[in-house]
Amino acid sequence: AYGIVSNVTDEKSVQDMVDEIVEKFGRLDVLVNNAGISQKVTVEDMTLDDMKRIFNVNMFGLFLVTQKCMKVMRAQKYGRIVNLSSVSGKRGGGIFGGAHYSASKAAVLAFSKNLSREICAEGITVNSVCPGLINTEIWKSLPKEEADKVIDGIPMGRPGETQEVANAIVFLASKEASYITGEEIDINGGSHMD
């Protein structure tokens, strides 16, 4: 593993990260856009700064990283881009986020489909995964009564595991997914079905 610290909201930081990857490895085959933040607040109590902060990371950061990485992928005529959205971006609402979070994740879905149409003929696929409730520290911090209520809305009767999300990402990043692009993969135990 090779780690690089980057601020996805800063264009120079993103370009420096991409340059370092290409210098070290000679190519860039897979991008997983996983940076994201959330905030639990109602629309009435939300400020414009709250909205901007969420979009700066969740959508504009994703845009910057994608734009810089896709230039490398286009030159090599190969690439896999997997963007993390959310079930909240498809149905609105959420346990841990407000309307600004849902809107930013819906924007990720629209951006991904549009980009897929722009570059799929060049050997680059663009897909999204839309996790629902996943067994993380935030989930574990919910009071039992609230957690039970959430689980009642999941037909599979449990939160997803991080490995289940990772499995979908690994598949979409693989050569086996070479004819899949512009898709949204739901990983939510049946809590939202299209």
Identify the function of each model-found stretch.
Residues 42-43, 50-55, 139, 146, ...:
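Substrate-binding pocket helix/loop in short-chain dehydrogenase/reductase
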Residues 66, 104, 112:
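Active-site helix of classical SDR
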